[in-house]
A protein has these predicted regions:
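Structural motif
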Residues: 88-89, 106, 119, 130-131, ...
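Small-molecule-sensing regulatory modules
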Residues: 16-54, 59-60, 67, 140, ...
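Short glycine-rich anion-binding loops that position phosphate/pyrophosphate groups of nucleotides
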Residues: 94-97, 179-181
Length: 305
């Protein structure tokens, strides 16, 4: 979809209202409010309007994300709203973003990262789950080591819907992001129990726990300085790994930068982690991550023969 010609980025801060495009799920709306509060504290006098958009992924609840993939299913219509001028900033769960933006759009930056770990949700009373519901190849590949005898299935829906299905016996366990539960204020839920998984046990998805802000390229220079530098660096490193390795959410690999430690998982190569020196710069770290991804791709190719 083509876009209109927009004024210089300085006009970004002269808008009477800044329109935030977001999905319409309860979690997405919470994240949009978080973005409005964060930006409102940094743009004096700014007012915000939420533009709710149903994406292809929201409309096609019967689709299997494992079969059809997830990258782009939850972002395209939101990006179209930016390009058409119907919105000014898109608020995304960073883990939903493809590695490349459409022409004319950029990821300006991120809000401070929340907890990035996965949470294992078990039906109360279950010790070893016979049936685990997750459509994520990444989660399945890592948790099969914990539960080798379990059968895997998939159910979709927002967080509350999934928890209700689980408590009602649709499965014995599922996996949700810790950040999503925290943002929704869910510390407990009748009929299920929560267990946060250590990062070395289950490496999170690229961008998990991050709220990313996307805008038109002309507005990015004005918006970028307001975003969170440390989180921007983490997201850049994780996306570098993803783009260097290739693939979308159907591929069973993961990357996470936390502290100075970069953790990765590859289904054919296993778990790895490297610790960067405190004084290393982003350019050096990006180079190391690119080399790591290239090495893993070669190792996986060799293993397949």
């Amino acid at each position: 979809m083509g876009g209109r010609i927009f004024p210089p980025s300085a006009a970004f801060f002269c808008m009477k209202k800044i329109r935030l495009a977001t999905r319409s799920s309860p979690l997405a709306l919470v994240q949009a409010r978080m973005a409005a509060e964060y930006l409102g504290a940094r743009i004096p006098g700014a007012e915000f309007e939420t533009v709710e958009i149903k994406t292809s992924g929201d409309r096609r609840q019967y689709w299997s994300l494992e079969k059809f993939g997830g990258k782009g299913l939850f972002t395209k219509e939101i990006e179209d709203a930016l390009l058409s001028g119907a919105a000014d900033i898109a608020v995304h769960s960073a883990k939903d973003l493809p590695t490349e933006c459409p022409g004319g759009l950029e990821i300006a930056g991120c809000l401070p990262r929340d907890e990035c770990a996965d949470t294992l949700v078990m039906r109360s009373g279950v010790q070893v789950p016979a049936l685990i519901a997750s459509g994520s190849p990444r989660r399945r590949a890592q948790l099969k080591k914990m539960f080798p005898q379990s059968v895997w299935t998939e159910f979709r829906g927002n967080v509350h819907t999934r928890l209700k299905k689980l408590a009602g016996g649709a499965a014995d366990a599922s996996v949700l992001s810790q950040a999503g539960l925290l943002r929704l204020g869910i510390g407990s839920f009748e009929g299920v129990e929560f267990r946060v998984l250590k990062l070395d046990l289950c490496v999170p998805a690229v961008g998990q726990g991050i709220i990313a802000l996307q805008c038109r390229s002309a507005d990015a220079p004005a918006l970028r300085p307001l975003t969170h530098g440390r989180t921007n660096e983490a997201f850049a490193l994780e996306r570098k790994f993803l783009s260097s390795l290739g693939g979308g959410c159907q591929s069973a690999y993961a990357a996470n930068f936390d502290g100075n430690v970069f953790r990765i998982f590859h289904e054919e190569c296993g778990f790895r982690k490297i610790e960067f020196p405190e004084n290393s710069g982003l350019g050096e770290r990006l180079s190391e991550v690119g080399k790591l991804a290239a090495g893993l791709a070669g190792e996986a190719s060799g293993a397949r023969g």
